[in-house]
Amino acid sequence: MNFNLVEMYNGLLRFNKHILNELAEGLKHLPNLDGVSKGDSLIINEQGNPAWGSAAFIPTFENAAYGIEWTKDDNDIIRIGNAKFHRELPIQNRLKGCVYNEKKISYFLNPTGWAKPLENGLIPPLDGSDGDVGVRVPEFYMCVKDTGTKYQLWISDFNIDGTFTRVHPFIISHTKTMTRTREDGKEEVFSACIKPDDTRYLGGNKNSSVVATKLQGRPRTGINYDKANEFCANRGDWITMIDYLEYCAIQALCYIEYASFDNQAALNTNLTSEGFKQGGLGAGVTNLAWDRWTAFNGNNPIVQTYWTAEHNIGNGSTNGDHYELGNYNTDGSNLNTYPAVYRGILNFFGDIWTLIRDVVIVNRNANYNSVYLLKKGVNHADITIDNIQDKCYFIGDQANSNNFITEFDFRFGPYFIPNKVGSNKKADYNWIRGSNGQDTDKAVRVLLFGGGAYDGSGAGSGHFGSYWVQSAFGAHVGFFTTVKLD
Protein backbone atom coordinates (compact mmCIF):
# COMPACT_ATOMS: atom_id res chain seq x y z
CA MET A 1 0.00 0.00 0.00
CA ASN A 2 1.16 3.58 -0.70
CA PHE A 3 1.58 5.17 2.74
CA ASN A 4 2.22 8.75 1.48
CA LEU A 5 -0.47 11.27 2.44
CA VAL A 6 0.11 13.15 -0.82
CA GLU A 7 0.70 11.28 -4.07
CA MET A 8 1.27 12.08 -7.74
CA TYR A 9 -1.59 11.14 -10.09
CA ASN A 10 -1.66 11.98 -13.82
CA GLY A 11 0.97 14.64 -13.24
CA LEU A 12 -0.96 16.31 -10.40
CA LEU A 13 -0.61 16.17 -6.62
CA ARG A 14 -3.59 14.80 -4.74
CA PHE A 15 -4.37 13.47 -1.28
CA ASN A 16 -4.16 9.69 -0.91
CA LYS A 17 -7.78 8.70 -0.29
CA HIS A 18 -6.84 5.35 1.25
CA ILE A 19 -4.71 7.02 3.94
CA LEU A 20 -7.43 9.62 4.54
CA ASN A 21 -10.00 6.85 4.97
CA GLU A 22 -7.77 5.06 7.48
CA LEU A 23 -7.25 8.34 9.39
CA ALA A 24 -10.98 9.03 9.38
CA GLU A 25 -11.68 5.55 10.70
CA GLY A 26 -9.22 6.10 13.53
CA LEU A 27 -10.59 9.55 14.39
CA LYS A 28 -14.06 8.07 14.92
CA HIS A 29 -12.78 6.43 18.08
CA LEU A 30 -11.25 9.56 19.67
CA PRO A 31 -13.03 10.86 22.79
CA ASN A 32 -14.67 14.30 22.70
CA LEU A 33 -12.84 17.33 24.08
CA ASP A 34 -15.12 18.00 27.06
CA GLY A 35 -12.99 18.73 30.11
CA VAL A 36 -9.66 18.42 28.32
CA SER A 37 -6.81 20.52 29.73
CA LYS A 38 -3.70 21.95 28.14
CA GLY A 39 -0.96 19.32 28.04
CA ASP A 40 -3.35 16.35 28.20
CA SER A 41 -2.61 13.44 25.89
CA LEU A 42 -4.57 10.50 24.59
CA ILE A 43 -4.53 7.59 27.05
CA ILE A 44 -6.39 4.35 27.61
CA ASN A 45 -8.31 4.46 30.88
CA GLU A 46 -8.89 1.60 33.32
CA GLN A 47 -11.97 0.53 31.38
CA GLY A 48 -9.91 0.16 28.20
CA ASN A 49 -11.47 3.20 26.54
CA PRO A 50 -9.59 6.08 24.87
CA ALA A 51 -9.61 9.22 27.01
CA TRP A 52 -7.78 12.52 27.46
CA GLY A 53 -5.51 12.72 30.50
CA SER A 54 -2.10 13.55 31.88
CA ALA A 55 -1.05 10.06 32.92
CA ALA A 56 1.14 8.09 30.54
CA PHE A 57 -0.54 4.99 29.15
CA ILE A 58 0.95 1.79 30.49
CA PRO A 59 -0.48 -1.25 28.67
CA THR A 60 -1.46 -4.14 30.94
CA PHE A 61 -3.24 -7.44 30.47
CA GLU A 62 -6.37 -5.84 31.95
CA ASN A 63 -6.56 -2.73 29.77
CA ALA A 64 -4.74 -3.65 26.55
CA ALA A 65 -5.20 -7.38 25.95
CA TYR A 66 -7.93 -9.96 25.61
CA GLY A 67 -7.94 -13.72 25.37
CA ILE A 68 -9.18 -17.02 26.74
CA GLU A 69 -8.27 -19.25 29.67
CA TRP A 70 -8.90 -22.93 30.26
CA THR A 71 -7.96 -25.66 32.71
CA LYS A 72 -5.42 -28.02 31.21
CA ASP A 73 -6.97 -31.12 29.63
CA ASP A 74 -10.43 -29.60 30.03
CA ASN A 75 -12.88 -27.60 27.92
CA ASP A 76 -13.91 -24.95 30.48
CA ILE A 77 -12.96 -21.96 28.34
CA ILE A 78 -13.61 -18.46 29.72
CA ARG A 79 -12.84 -14.99 28.38
CA ILE A 80 -10.15 -12.96 30.14
CA GLY A 81 -8.72 -9.46 29.85
CA ASN A 82 -10.52 -6.39 28.56
CA ALA A 83 -14.22 -7.27 28.24
CA LYS A 84 -14.80 -4.29 25.94
CA PHE A 85 -12.30 -5.73 23.49
CA HIS A 86 -14.16 -9.06 23.56
CA ARG A 87 -17.31 -7.23 22.50
CA GLU A 88 -15.69 -4.96 19.92
CA LEU A 89 -12.98 -7.38 18.66
CA PRO A 90 -10.58 -4.59 17.61
CA ILE A 91 -7.89 -6.86 16.15
CA GLN A 92 -10.27 -9.22 14.36
CA ASN A 93 -12.16 -6.27 12.88
CA ARG A 94 -8.99 -5.06 11.19
CA LEU A 95 -8.96 -8.08 8.88
CA LYS A 96 -10.07 -6.58 5.58
CA GLY A 97 -10.61 -7.84 2.07
CA CYS A 98 -8.42 -6.05 -0.44
CA VAL A 99 -7.04 -5.99 -3.96
CA TYR A 100 -3.26 -5.89 -3.97
CA ASN A 101 -0.31 -5.83 -6.35
CA GLU A 102 2.74 -7.49 -4.87
CA LYS A 103 3.29 -5.80 -1.47
CA LYS A 104 1.06 -2.80 -2.21
CA ILE A 105 -2.62 -2.71 -1.33
CA SER A 106 -4.43 -0.99 -4.19
CA TYR A 107 -7.73 -0.63 -2.33
CA PHE A 108 -9.87 -2.24 0.33
CA LEU A 109 -13.06 -3.96 -0.78
CA ASN A 110 -16.60 -3.23 0.37
CA PRO A 111 -16.82 -4.86 3.82
CA THR A 112 -20.43 -5.96 3.26
CA GLY A 113 -19.76 -7.67 -0.06
CA TRP A 114 -16.62 -7.66 -2.16
CA ALA A 115 -18.50 -7.49 -5.46
CA LYS A 116 -20.41 -4.41 -4.30
CA PRO A 117 -19.36 -0.90 -5.33
CA LEU A 118 -16.59 0.89 -3.47
CA GLU A 119 -17.15 4.29 -1.84
CA ASN A 120 -16.26 5.99 -5.13
CA GLY A 121 -18.86 3.93 -6.99
CA LEU A 122 -16.34 1.66 -8.71
CA ILE A 123 -17.40 -1.97 -9.01
CA PRO A 124 -14.10 -3.76 -8.44
CA PRO A 125 -12.96 -6.44 -10.87
CA LEU A 126 -12.18 -9.52 -8.80
CA ASP A 127 -10.81 -11.70 -11.61
CA GLY A 128 -7.18 -10.71 -11.09
CA SER A 129 -7.10 -8.04 -13.79
CA ASP A 130 -6.78 -5.28 -11.18
CA GLY A 131 -4.61 -7.27 -8.79
CA ASP A 132 -4.90 -10.28 -6.50
CA VAL A 133 -7.71 -10.64 -3.97
CA GLY A 134 -6.84 -11.35 -0.36
CA VAL A 135 -7.45 -10.53 3.29
CA ARG A 136 -5.12 -8.09 5.05
CA VAL A 137 -4.20 -9.34 8.54
CA PRO A 138 -2.91 -6.57 10.84
CA GLU A 139 0.18 -6.57 13.00
CA PHE A 140 -0.50 -7.75 16.56
CA TYR A 141 1.07 -9.71 19.39
CA MET A 142 0.08 -13.02 20.94
CA CYS A 143 1.32 -15.24 23.74
CA VAL A 144 0.41 -18.27 25.82
CA LYS A 145 0.80 -18.18 29.61
CA ASP A 146 1.15 -21.36 31.68
CA THR A 147 -0.18 -20.74 35.20
CA GLY A 148 0.48 -24.29 36.35
CA THR A 149 -3.06 -25.66 36.17
CA LYS A 150 -4.34 -23.44 33.37
CA TYR A 151 -3.34 -22.02 30.00
CA GLN A 152 -4.06 -18.46 28.90
CA LEU A 153 -4.04 -17.37 25.24
CA TRP A 154 -3.65 -13.60 24.84
CA ILE A 155 -3.66 -11.12 21.93
CA SER A 156 -2.83 -7.42 22.07
CA ASP A 157 -1.54 -4.46 20.10
CA PHE A 158 1.35 -4.31 22.57
CA ASN A 159 4.14 -6.62 23.70
CA ILE A 160 2.96 -6.04 27.23
CA ASP A 161 5.55 -7.89 29.29
CA GLY A 162 8.14 -8.79 26.67
CA THR A 163 6.92 -12.38 26.27
CA PHE A 164 4.54 -11.84 23.36
CA THR A 165 5.32 -13.06 19.84
CA ARG A 166 4.91 -10.42 17.15
CA VAL A 167 2.69 -11.34 14.22
CA HIS A 168 3.84 -9.35 11.20
CA PRO A 169 1.17 -7.74 9.02
CA PHE A 170 0.43 -9.89 5.98
CA ILE A 171 -2.08 -10.60 3.25
CA ILE A 172 -3.51 -14.11 2.98
CA SER A 173 -5.09 -15.40 -0.23
CA HIS A 174 -8.85 -15.24 0.33
CA THR A 175 -9.04 -19.02 -0.13
CA LYS A 176 -6.55 -21.72 -1.08
CA THR A 177 -4.64 -20.30 -4.01
CA MET A 178 -5.28 -20.72 -7.70
CA THR A 179 -2.65 -20.79 -10.44
CA ARG A 180 -2.38 -19.48 -13.98
CA THR A 181 -0.02 -20.37 -16.83
CA ARG A 182 2.20 -17.65 -18.25
CA GLU A 183 3.24 -17.20 -21.87
CA ASP A 184 6.54 -18.94 -21.12
CA GLY A 185 4.60 -22.02 -19.96
CA LYS A 186 5.41 -21.60 -16.27
CA GLU A 187 2.64 -21.92 -13.72
CA GLU A 188 2.35 -19.26 -11.03
CA VAL A 189 0.09 -18.66 -8.05
CA PHE A 190 -2.56 -15.97 -8.00
CA SER A 191 -5.63 -15.25 -5.90
CA ALA A 192 -8.90 -14.06 -7.40
CA CYS A 193 -12.65 -14.66 -7.36
CA ILE A 194 -13.30 -16.80 -10.44
CA LYS A 195 -16.62 -18.24 -11.60
CA PRO A 196 -16.91 -21.91 -12.63
CA ASP A 197 -17.77 -21.01 -16.22
CA ASP A 198 -14.47 -19.16 -16.74
CA THR A 199 -12.53 -21.46 -19.07
CA ARG A 200 -9.25 -19.61 -18.54
CA TYR A 201 -8.60 -21.05 -15.10
CA LEU A 202 -8.71 -24.80 -14.60
CA GLY A 203 -8.01 -25.70 -10.98
CA GLY A 204 -7.70 -28.83 -8.90
CA ASN A 205 -5.36 -31.43 -10.36
CA LYS A 206 -6.40 -30.46 -13.92
CA ASN A 207 -7.65 -33.99 -14.58
CA SER A 208 -9.04 -34.10 -18.13
CA SER A 209 -11.46 -36.87 -17.19
CA VAL A 210 -13.31 -34.53 -14.81
CA VAL A 211 -15.96 -32.22 -16.26
CA ALA A 212 -14.27 -28.85 -16.66
CA THR A 213 -16.98 -26.88 -14.86
CA LYS A 214 -16.20 -28.91 -11.74
CA LEU A 215 -12.57 -27.72 -11.82
CA GLN A 216 -12.76 -24.21 -13.26
CA GLY A 217 -12.40 -21.41 -10.74
CA ARG A 218 -11.14 -23.81 -8.06
CA PRO A 219 -7.87 -23.76 -6.07
CA ARG A 220 -4.84 -25.61 -7.44
CA THR A 221 -4.22 -29.08 -6.03
CA GLY A 222 -2.51 -32.30 -7.10
CA ILE A 223 0.99 -30.93 -6.43
CA ASN A 224 3.59 -31.70 -3.78
CA TYR A 225 5.33 -29.37 -1.32
CA ASP A 226 8.23 -28.51 -3.66
CA LYS A 227 5.93 -27.81 -6.61
CA ALA A 228 3.85 -25.46 -4.45
CA ASN A 229 7.02 -23.57 -3.54
CA GLU A 230 8.00 -23.46 -7.21
CA PHE A 231 4.67 -21.94 -8.25
CA CYS A 232 5.15 -19.24 -5.59
CA ALA A 233 8.71 -18.54 -6.74
CA ASN A 234 7.48 -18.25 -10.34
CA ARG A 235 5.28 -15.35 -9.23
CA GLY A 236 8.05 -13.58 -7.31
CA ASP A 237 10.05 -13.54 -4.10
CA TRP A 238 7.33 -11.49 -2.38
CA ILE A 239 4.83 -14.36 -2.05
CA THR A 240 5.09 -17.74 -0.31
CA MET A 241 3.03 -20.57 1.07
CA ILE A 242 1.51 -19.68 4.42
CA ASP A 243 3.93 -20.32 7.28
CA TYR A 244 3.14 -21.81 10.67
CA LEU A 245 3.10 -18.60 12.72
CA GLU A 246 0.78 -16.91 10.23
CA TYR A 247 -1.60 -19.87 10.33
CA CYS A 248 -1.56 -20.05 14.14
CA ALA A 249 -2.21 -16.30 14.32
CA ILE A 250 -5.50 -16.68 12.44
CA GLN A 251 -6.37 -19.72 14.56
CA ALA A 252 -5.84 -17.65 17.70
CA LEU A 253 -8.04 -14.83 16.44
CA CYS A 254 -10.89 -17.25 15.74
CA TYR A 255 -10.49 -19.18 19.00
CA ILE A 256 -10.62 -15.96 21.02
CA GLU A 257 -13.49 -14.44 19.03
CA TYR A 258 -15.78 -17.39 19.78
CA ALA A 259 -14.11 -18.48 23.06
CA SER A 260 -14.01 -22.01 21.67
CA PHE A 261 -11.56 -24.42 20.07
CA ASP A 262 -14.41 -26.06 18.15
CA ASN A 263 -14.54 -24.16 14.85
CA GLN A 264 -17.36 -26.47 13.77
CA ALA A 265 -19.73 -25.37 16.52
CA ALA A 266 -23.13 -24.49 15.09
CA LEU A 267 -23.56 -21.05 13.57
CA ASN A 268 -25.25 -18.66 16.02
CA THR A 269 -25.54 -15.04 14.90
CA ASN A 270 -26.99 -13.91 18.24
CA LEU A 271 -24.69 -12.39 20.84
CA THR A 272 -24.61 -13.56 24.44
CA SER A 273 -26.23 -11.43 27.15
CA GLU A 274 -22.77 -9.90 27.72
CA GLY A 275 -22.49 -8.93 24.05
CA PHE A 276 -19.99 -11.66 23.07
CA LYS A 277 -19.86 -13.86 19.98
CA GLN A 278 -20.99 -17.45 20.47
CA GLY A 279 -21.23 -20.67 18.47
CA GLY A 280 -18.77 -21.20 15.63
CA LEU A 281 -18.37 -21.29 11.87
CA GLY A 282 -20.56 -24.33 11.29
CA ALA A 283 -19.63 -27.73 9.88
CA GLY A 284 -17.94 -26.43 6.73
CA VAL A 285 -17.55 -28.47 3.55
CA THR A 286 -16.96 -31.70 5.45
CA ASN A 287 -20.03 -33.87 4.80
CA LEU A 288 -18.98 -35.69 1.60
CA ALA A 289 -18.32 -39.43 1.55
CA TRP A 290 -14.95 -40.21 -0.05
CA ASP A 291 -16.34 -42.56 -2.71
CA ARG A 292 -19.10 -40.15 -3.76
CA TRP A 293 -16.62 -37.27 -3.81
CA THR A 294 -14.39 -39.38 -6.05
CA ALA A 295 -17.26 -40.06 -8.43
CA PHE A 296 -18.33 -36.40 -8.42
CA ASN A 297 -15.04 -34.71 -9.34
CA GLY A 298 -12.13 -36.97 -8.41
CA ASN A 299 -11.72 -35.52 -4.88
CA ASN A 300 -10.90 -32.11 -6.27
CA PRO A 301 -11.96 -28.82 -4.60
CA ILE A 302 -15.71 -28.36 -4.37
CA VAL A 303 -16.29 -24.62 -4.00
CA GLN A 304 -15.24 -22.11 -6.66
CA THR A 305 -13.29 -19.05 -5.53
CA TYR A 306 -16.11 -16.64 -6.50
CA TRP A 307 -18.51 -18.05 -3.92
CA THR A 308 -17.98 -15.51 -1.12
CA ALA A 309 -18.29 -12.59 -3.54
CA GLU A 310 -21.47 -14.09 -4.98
CA HIS A 311 -22.97 -14.42 -1.49
CA ASN A 312 -21.91 -10.97 -0.25
CA ILE A 313 -20.05 -12.26 2.78
CA GLY A 314 -17.46 -9.50 2.53
CA ASN A 315 -15.24 -9.22 5.60
CA GLY A 316 -17.67 -11.31 7.61
CA SER A 317 -17.78 -14.98 8.53
CA THR A 318 -20.09 -17.92 7.78
CA ASN A 319 -23.60 -16.63 7.10
CA GLY A 320 -25.48 -19.91 6.69
CA ASP A 321 -25.60 -19.94 2.89
CA HIS A 322 -25.05 -23.31 1.26
CA TYR A 323 -23.30 -24.63 -1.82
CA GLU A 324 -25.32 -27.11 -3.88
CA LEU A 325 -23.67 -30.07 -5.61
CA GLY A 326 -25.91 -31.03 -8.50
CA ASN A 327 -26.57 -34.72 -9.19
CA TYR A 328 -24.18 -35.69 -6.40
CA ASN A 329 -25.99 -38.61 -4.74
CA THR A 330 -26.36 -42.08 -6.26
CA ASP A 331 -30.06 -41.45 -6.89
CA GLY A 332 -29.26 -38.30 -8.85
CA SER A 333 -30.34 -35.90 -6.12
CA ASN A 334 -28.35 -32.88 -5.03
CA LEU A 335 -26.28 -32.41 -1.87
CA ASN A 336 -26.00 -29.20 0.13
CA THR A 337 -22.80 -28.31 1.95
CA TYR A 338 -22.00 -25.21 3.99
CA PRO A 339 -18.64 -23.48 3.41
CA ALA A 340 -16.87 -22.19 6.52
CA VAL A 341 -15.74 -18.58 6.17
CA TYR A 342 -13.69 -16.67 8.73
CA ARG A 343 -13.38 -12.92 8.26
CA GLY A 344 -13.53 -13.24 4.47
CA ILE A 345 -11.27 -16.31 4.30
CA LEU A 346 -13.22 -18.95 2.36
CA ASN A 347 -12.87 -22.56 3.49
CA PHE A 348 -10.72 -21.64 6.48
CA PHE A 349 -11.10 -25.37 7.06
CA GLY A 350 -12.78 -28.13 5.08
CA ASP A 351 -13.17 -28.76 1.33
CA ILE A 352 -9.41 -29.33 0.87
CA TRP A 353 -6.38 -29.38 3.18
CA THR A 354 -3.66 -26.72 3.17
CA LEU A 355 0.09 -27.29 3.19
CA ILE A 356 2.21 -25.31 5.69
CA ARG A 357 5.53 -23.98 4.44
CA ASP A 358 8.18 -24.21 7.16
CA VAL A 359 7.34 -27.25 9.33
CA VAL A 360 9.22 -30.56 9.55
CA ILE A 361 7.88 -33.54 11.51
CA VAL A 362 9.78 -36.74 12.36
CA ASN A 363 8.80 -39.62 14.61
CA ARG A 364 10.53 -39.43 17.98
CA ASN A 365 9.28 -42.55 19.78
CA ALA A 366 6.12 -44.54 20.41
CA ASN A 367 4.52 -41.60 22.20
CA TYR A 368 5.48 -38.54 20.17
CA ASN A 369 6.44 -37.06 16.80
CA SER A 370 8.84 -34.12 17.04
CA VAL A 371 7.80 -30.88 15.33
CA TYR A 372 10.41 -28.44 13.98
CA LEU A 373 10.61 -25.11 12.17
CA LEU A 374 13.12 -24.71 9.37
CA LYS A 375 15.93 -22.26 10.06
CA LYS A 376 16.21 -19.33 7.67
CA GLY A 377 17.63 -20.30 4.28
CA VAL A 378 17.14 -24.05 4.80
CA ASN A 379 15.05 -26.02 2.31
CA HIS A 380 12.73 -28.81 3.37
CA ALA A 381 14.47 -31.17 0.94
CA ASP A 382 17.77 -30.66 2.78
CA ILE A 383 16.47 -32.14 6.04
CA THR A 384 17.41 -35.65 7.15
CA ILE A 385 17.06 -37.46 10.43
CA ASP A 386 20.78 -36.85 10.97
CA ASN A 387 20.92 -33.07 10.44
CA ILE A 388 17.50 -32.00 11.68
CA GLN A 389 18.85 -30.71 15.00
CA ASP A 390 21.28 -28.38 13.23
CA LYS A 391 18.98 -27.11 10.48
CA CYS A 392 15.75 -26.71 12.44
CA TYR A 393 14.30 -25.31 15.67
CA PHE A 394 12.39 -27.76 17.85
CA ILE A 395 8.98 -26.33 18.81
CA GLY A 396 7.05 -29.22 20.36
CA ASP A 397 5.79 -32.79 20.35
CA GLN A 398 2.78 -34.13 18.47
CA ALA A 399 0.94 -36.99 20.14
CA ASN A 400 1.67 -40.18 18.19
CA SER A 401 -1.96 -41.36 18.09
CA ASN A 402 -4.98 -40.75 15.89
CA ASN A 403 -7.78 -39.14 17.90
CA PHE A 404 -9.40 -35.86 18.84
CA ILE A 405 -7.13 -33.19 20.30
CA THR A 406 -7.47 -32.65 24.06
CA GLU A 407 -4.43 -30.42 24.71
CA PHE A 408 -1.61 -28.54 22.99
CA ASP A 409 2.15 -28.24 23.46
CA PHE A 410 2.88 -24.55 24.09
CA ARG A 411 6.37 -24.90 25.59
CA PHE A 412 8.14 -23.12 22.73
CA GLY A 413 5.62 -20.55 21.53
CA PRO A 414 2.01 -19.94 20.49
CA TYR A 415 1.83 -22.99 18.23
CA PHE A 416 -1.24 -25.23 18.44
CA ILE A 417 0.62 -28.55 18.38
CA PRO A 418 -1.66 -31.41 19.52
CA ASN A 419 0.16 -32.97 22.46
CA LYS A 420 -2.64 -35.03 23.98
CA VAL A 421 -5.55 -36.81 22.32
CA GLY A 422 -8.66 -38.69 23.36
CA SER A 423 -12.39 -38.97 22.93
CA ASN A 424 -13.14 -35.83 25.01
CA LYS A 425 -12.83 -33.49 22.03
CA LYS A 426 -11.39 -30.04 22.65
CA ALA A 427 -10.30 -29.23 19.11
CA ASP A 428 -10.51 -31.13 15.83
CA TYR A 429 -8.42 -34.21 15.01
CA ASN A 430 -4.82 -35.33 15.21
CA TRP A 431 -3.76 -37.54 12.29
CA ILE A 432 -0.41 -39.32 12.17
CA ARG A 433 1.34 -41.68 9.78
CA GLY A 434 0.48 -45.33 10.33
CA SER A 435 -0.99 -46.92 13.43
CA ASN A 436 -0.96 -45.51 16.94
CA GLY A 437 2.42 -45.73 18.61
CA GLN A 438 4.44 -46.69 15.51
CA ASP A 439 8.12 -45.85 16.01
CA THR A 440 9.87 -47.43 13.01
CA ASP A 441 8.98 -44.99 10.21
CA LYS A 442 11.42 -42.07 10.61
CA ALA A 443 10.65 -40.35 7.29
CA VAL A 444 10.77 -36.55 7.18
CA ARG A 445 7.20 -35.27 6.87
CA VAL A 446 5.32 -32.07 6.07
CA LEU A 447 2.36 -30.53 7.88
CA LEU A 448 -1.21 -30.33 6.58
CA PHE A 449 -4.02 -28.38 8.25
CA GLY A 450 -7.78 -28.02 8.16
CA GLY A 451 -9.16 -31.31 6.91
CA GLY A 452 -11.02 -32.09 3.71
CA ALA A 453 -14.56 -32.54 2.46
CA TYR A 454 -14.74 -36.08 3.86
CA ASP A 455 -13.45 -35.41 7.40
CA GLY A 456 -16.71 -34.70 9.18
CA SER A 457 -16.37 -33.72 12.84
CA GLY A 458 -12.59 -34.18 12.70
CA ALA A 459 -12.15 -31.10 10.49
CA GLY A 460 -11.41 -27.59 11.71
CA SER A 461 -8.56 -25.12 11.59
CA GLY A 462 -6.72 -27.24 14.16
CA HIS A 463 -6.99 -30.54 12.25
CA PHE A 464 -3.31 -31.47 12.27
CA GLY A 465 -1.97 -33.98 9.73
CA SER A 466 1.59 -35.32 9.72
CA TYR A 467 1.02 -38.32 7.48
CA TRP A 468 2.48 -36.87 4.23
CA VAL A 469 6.09 -37.02 3.10
CA GLN A 470 7.45 -34.15 1.06
CA SER A 471 6.90 -35.84 -2.32
CA ALA A 472 3.24 -36.72 -1.67
CA PHE A 473 0.41 -35.01 -3.55
CA GLY A 474 -3.33 -35.34 -3.94
CA ALA A 475 -6.36 -33.70 -5.51
CA HIS A 476 -7.67 -32.91 -2.01
CA VAL A 477 -4.68 -30.81 -0.85
CA GLY A 478 -3.85 -27.22 -1.82
CA PHE A 479 -2.35 -24.26 0.02
CA PHE A 480 -2.89 -20.67 1.13
CA THR A 481 -0.39 -18.03 0.05
CA THR A 482 0.72 -15.00 2.05
CA VAL A 483 2.48 -11.72 1.36
CA LYS A 484 4.48 -10.26 4.25
CA LEU A 485 3.97 -6.50 4.46
CA ASP A 486 7.17 -5.66 6.35
Predicted regions, residues:
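Acidic glycine-/aspartate-rich tracts in secreted/extracellular proteins
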Residues: I44-N49, F140-M142, T177-M178, E246, ...
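Residues within well-ordered beta-strands of beta-sheet-rich folds
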Residues: R136-P138, I171-S173, G344-F349, F480-K484
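Short aromatic-cysteine micro-motif
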Residues: P124, G128-G131, S156-F348
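Extracellular repetitive beta-rich solenoid segments
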Residues: A24-F57
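A short, polar/charged loop-to-alpha-helix boundary motif
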Residues: V362-K376
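C-terminal, surface-exposed recognition/capping segments
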Residues: C248, N270-A309, L325, F348-V360, ...
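Short, intrinsically disordered N-terminal pre-domain segments
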Residues: M1-L20, D486
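N-terminal module-boundary/linker segments of secreted carbohydrate-active enzymes
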Residues: F57-T163
